[in-house]
């Protein structure tokens, strides 16, 4: 029994690896591409796109302003013609960056929040709230937030709940 308490003390004081942290409920991580189906729903529901609209992904999305910055799709050669359906199946960053730009951060945050992201789930064992994407002054991060990058952090249980809500 003393060995158990000694090992427990060692594990509980390990702040770097945190071996006792329930990562499914209390770990928060950038959602990445797991957020794309929810962003697709938001884009369709808010009316910024339709199921039949086609975009051409050249592999590099350019921010439509005088700033001129942009981002690369994971497929540097581009996906070519993409619709919302092919953007989800091909995990097309270009498409979702454009949808994020069209919706803006406020709309994205509203939809993500409506799916329970950025809030505790209420499960009995407790969980982390995570955080919705933020908009630092002078920066438009909506294109990045739309495909799970930028500043948002969610727990795996939050994402599982959000995706279950989407498909039910």
Locations of the language-model features?
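Beta-lactam-recognizing serine transpeptidase/beta-lactamase-like catalytic domain environment
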Residues: 1-33, 38-168
């Amino acid at each position: 029994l003393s060995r158990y308490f000694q090992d427990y003390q060692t594990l509980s004081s390990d702040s770097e690896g945190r071996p006792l942290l329930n990562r499914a409920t209390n770990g928060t991580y950038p959602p990445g591409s797991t957020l794309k189906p929810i962003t697709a729903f938001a884009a369709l529901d808010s009316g910024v796109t339709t199921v039949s609209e086609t975009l051409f992904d050249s592999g590099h999305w350019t921010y439509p302003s005088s700033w001129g910055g942009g981002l690369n799709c994971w497929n540097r050669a581009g996906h070519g013609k993409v619709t919302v359906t092919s953007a989800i199946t091909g995990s097309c960053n270009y498409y979702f960056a454009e949808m994020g730009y069209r919706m803006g951060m406020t709309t994205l945050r509203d939809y993500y929040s409506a799916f329970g992201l950025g809030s505790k789930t209420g499960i009995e064992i407790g969980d982390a709230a995570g955080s919705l994407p933020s908009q630092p002054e002078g920066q438009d991060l909506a294109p990045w937030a739309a495909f799970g990058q930028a500043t948002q952090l969610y727990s795996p249980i939050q994402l599982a709940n959000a995706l279950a809500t989407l498909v039910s």
